[in-house]
């Protein structure tokens, strides 16, 4: 991953981890975009442990827009996930991929962020 080519944010560049992490069901994952971040959860793991299916969180914003604080579980402690919003990823060629595209992921981290300047 190259700063300025794959990401415009130094924080996202530092967060993204292209190394292999053995995914586990229930593990949190953060996808690092150009400046934003999206929170996902592992819902299924492939038999060879080199791929998994992620489901997108549907976090609820807490406070005002610039605070960037989110609630990821409902009152009962159940994760708030978007129905039908999934992504299947595979680790190949030393990168996490979704189809032919490389995705910049941070495992064991749940972080939602929307850049307010856009």
Report each predicted region and the residues it spans.
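Basic/aromatic-rich interaction segments and small domains that mediate binding to polyanionic partners
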Residues: 45-65
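Short, extreme N-terminal segment that most often corresponds to the first beta-strand
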Residues: 2-7, 27-28
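Short intrinsically disordered terminal tails
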Residues: 1, 23, 117-118
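His-enriched metal-coordination microenvironments in redox/metal-binding proteins
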Residues: 32-37, 117-118
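Short alpha-helix capping/helix-loop boundary micro-motifs
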Residues: 8-19
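Short coil-to-beta transition motif at edge beta-strands of beta-rich domains
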Residues: 17-33
């Amino acid at each position: 991953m190259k700063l300025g080519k794959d990401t415009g944010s130094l924080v996202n560049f530092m967060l993204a981890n292209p190394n292999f992490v053995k995914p586990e069901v229930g593990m949190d994952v953060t996808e690092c975009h150009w400046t934003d971040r999206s929170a996902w959860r592992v819902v299924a793991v492939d038999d060879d442990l080199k791929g998994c299916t992620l489901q997108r969180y549907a976090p609820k914003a807490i406070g005002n827009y610039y605070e960037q604080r989110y609630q990821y579980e409902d009152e009962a402690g159940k994760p708030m996930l978007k129905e039908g919003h999934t992504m299947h990823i595979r680790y190949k060629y030393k990168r996490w991929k979704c189809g032919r595209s490389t995705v910049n992921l941070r495992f064991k981290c749940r972080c939602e962020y929307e850049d307010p300047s856009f």
